[in-house]
Amino acid sequence: MQTFSKLLSMTALSAALALASLSSAEAAPKKDFKVAWSIYVGWMPWGYAADHGIVKKWADKYGINIEVTQFNDYVESMNQYTAGAFDAVTLTNMDGLSIPAAGGVDTTAVIVGDFSNGNDALILKDKDKLEDVKGQNVNLVEFSVSHYLLARALESIGSSERDVKVINTSDADMVAAYQTAEVSAVVTWNPLVATILEDKSAKTVFDSSQIPG
C-alpha cells in the first residue's frame, strides 16, 4: 500500500547513498541529483525540507547538489524517473515493480517511509456500504496501489473487478472529478481522501487499515 511507500530518503545522506548506488558504473562520483515527489501525505516532508533549506543543508554537508521537484501527477513522476530525467522518485513498493521495473530501471529503496493505516480509501457518494460499489464506475489511478486496494475491497465481499468499471483518473484530477455529477466512486490517498471527505456526500466504505500488513 501507500504505506509500504518507498521514500528514497528524508536526509541528503541517505539520498546520496541511494543515488550513488544507481551510478556506481560512472568513472567519477556523481555530484548532482534530481529527486521527484508527488502529493501523498507520507511524501510531503520532501516539499517542506526543500522549501526550508533542509535538503540544501545536508547536501552541502556531503558536497553534493540535490534538486527536488514536485509533481501533481503520480504516474508522470514515475514516467519521468523511468525515462532517466530524475535520479530518485517517491513511490510505493508495489508501484516500483510496475512502471520503473517494466522500463528496465534497477531501483533501490532506501527506507520504508510510512505505513498506510487508512491513508488509502474507497469512497462512495451518498452510499455507506461497500456492497454499494457493485455496478458503479470507479475512478482511480489505473494499475497503481489504488487499483490493488479496489481489488482487495471487492474480494472481501466475494466480488471482483467484473462487477465495476474502472475509470483511469489522474490523482491531480481526483478531487475535481469527485465533485462532478458523473462520478460516484473513487479510490485515492491522503491528503486527497481528507479533501474529498469534506463533502458531506462522501463516505469511506473501505480503506487500507482493513488489509493486514
PLM regions: where:
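Bacterial N-terminal signal peptides
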Residues: S9-A20
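A local structural motif
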Residues: A28-K34, K56-Q70, A85, K134, ...
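Short, polar/charged alpha-helical segment
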Residues: D32, I39-Q70, I99-A102, Y148-E155
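Short beta-strand->loop
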Residues: A36-I39, I111-V112, G135-V145, I157, ...
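Alpha-to-beta junction loops
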Residues: Y81-T92, G103-T107, Q136-N137, Q179-T188, ...
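Pocket-lining segment of extracytoplasmic ligand-binding domains
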Residues: D95, V166-I167, A172-G213
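Periplasmic-binding protein-like
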Residues: G113-L124, K203-G213
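Flexible hinge/capping segments at coil-to-helix
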Residues: L124-N137
